């Protein structure tokens, strides 16, 4: 399961992962959390509120929003929609190349 944590109006908002053996839990947070968080070097602030989709070719993508102002340091609800690839690394951990602030190819 992915989830958003912290206050969406601030830079500490981000996306985390939790796993469980059953839909009702118990849930365990991923050791490598957060999956995405603010990265001002990439021009990204406060990624969150996400969905994961699988394309016809089997690739996973994460669709999320982030602050439109990449240097957000105050409450802001001006958001843009983003999409980035998700993949499992050689150890079976869910990873992404995101968050990004650049256009991505249409899946």
Protein language model annotation of sequence segments:
Residues 1-107:
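Carbohydrate-active catalytic/glycan-binding domains of CAZyme proteins
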């Amino acid at each position: 399961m992915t989830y958003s944590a912290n206050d969406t109006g601030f830079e500490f908002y981000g996306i985390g992962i939790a796993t469980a053996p059953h839909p009702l839990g118990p849930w365990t947070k991923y050791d490598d959390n957060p999956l995405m968080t603010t990265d001002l070097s990439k021009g990204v602030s406060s990624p969150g509120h996400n969905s994961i989709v699988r394309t016809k070719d089997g690739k996973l993508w994460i669709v999320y929003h982030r602050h439109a102002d990449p240097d957000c340091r105050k409450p802001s609800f001006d958001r843009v929609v983003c999409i980035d690839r998700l993949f499992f690394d050689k150890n079976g951990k869910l990873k992404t190349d995101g968050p990004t602030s650049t256009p991505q190819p249409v899946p």
